[in-house]
Amino acid sequence: MADGKIKSGAQLAPNKTLDAALEAIVNSAAQPLSSLSVLAVKAGKTVYHKQFGAKWIDVTNPANNKPADAATMYRIASISKLVTTLGVMKLVETGKLNLDEDVSKYLGYTLRNPHFADTPITLRQMLSHTSSLRDDGGYYWEASLKLGLRDVLLPGGVGYGKGAMWARNAKPGVYFQYANLPWGVIGSVMESVTGERFDRLMRRLVLDPMALPGGFHPADLSDADLANVATLYRKRTEVNGKEVWNSSGPWIPQVDDHSKQRPAPRALPDYKISTNGTLFGPQGNCRLSAAGLAEIMLMLMNDGVHRGKVILKPATVAEMLREQWRHNGKGEKVAGGSNGDPNGEADFGSARRLMNAWGLGNQHFLDITGAGNGDRLVRAGGYRAYGHLGDAWGLKSAMVFNPFSRDGMIYLIGGHGVDPETTPGEYSGMYRHEEKILDALYTLAVNPAQ
């Protein structure tokens, strides 16, 4: 079972060596970070939990900066997909959803890739990024646009355009391409079968039963919880549509700066349930702390049990973590026999070979290594894991764990002072500072050999 409430750094044995290593990473001239929250689990117990930097920065008077702490929540970006999957699997358990059913049944209209009109699209495909949906036509439509997903996804719809959201070269179920759009469809499906708005449904199914503050809709957070949400930063502006980084310049807020006013609601009062599942960001809009992610990690390690309460059945967790796709090593071209693109172009750059195997809403890290490419998590190798990465608005994040050794690591980076593309990894497709964070956590806190 989990070791009770996640402990803050002050409640754990001191680890000054790791403190110093992470402090040096955060304050590095090569890649300064606005804030960092980390957590390490060893043999099923939290052994390290620490924060560095500021969750909110006053560029005119640093004395007013608000330091990140154990309660600080971040917009966790694509780790949200793993959280959303927990909600899907709860609905599968109750019989409201079937992973292999044609999702048209749930949506109320026929959803097909028009280039492969005879092939149904399923939740299993969408959760494993093999649905043939692509991000090229967009993946979020704000409420003011008054568009439903059917207006975007169906030929002839007012938002369909040139149909860039559909793959032309691979039918559903056969080719992996990391994408965000399927998660908007998943959100609509979840709303359709429950009659509940996605963000509130996720609170009922997952966050409230686990007593986790945060959620997918900041406008609904209490003032106290909202004050715990970190602002994400970059030292970057745009000039004529091009990024301009200035490492000696000020930290520029990117998202979640609520210092002057509360966030606006994402849905209009007349929102019709299930019409636009992208509104609340099932793919990336969840706010959680490192401690909150650790509760989820430990629940999955414990076969679905969280502090004595069954969140998911053991068989459900096993199915969620079971491998659904693995790259066949034949590059990324369908014509060359490839079964997927391991480069993760939608969110994670290109030519980085970062994605090599997938479960349902979770990545499988196979310890593949190369200079600036691969999914290796620690320099010495040998650590395979499940989990997810995140990358958006200056944040980079990771939640990775091995349920067999019961070890895991979490980091949430609140902002970058230098373009991460200038600091590629030495032995993986992650950036160099991400490698350093994970390697420090592993060697100085997690290493099972210690």
Task: Describe the predicted segments one by one.
Residues L12-Y74, M165-W166:
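Short, conserved catalytic-motif segment at the N-terminal edge
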Residues W56, P114-R379:
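Short, surface-exposed loop or secondary-structure junction motifs
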Residues W56-A68, P420-H433:
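A short, polar/charged loop-to-alpha-helix boundary motif
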Residues D19-I25, V38, G44, R75-D100, ...:
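Active-site SXXK
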Residues G281, W393-S397:
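Short, surface-exposed coil-to-beta transition loops
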Residues K396-N402, R406-T423:
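Short, well-ordered beta-strand elements
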Residues R379-G387:
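Short, hydrophobic/aromatic-rich segments at coil-to-beta transitions
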Residues V47, A63, D69-A71, V83, ...:
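Short, well-structured active-site flanking segments
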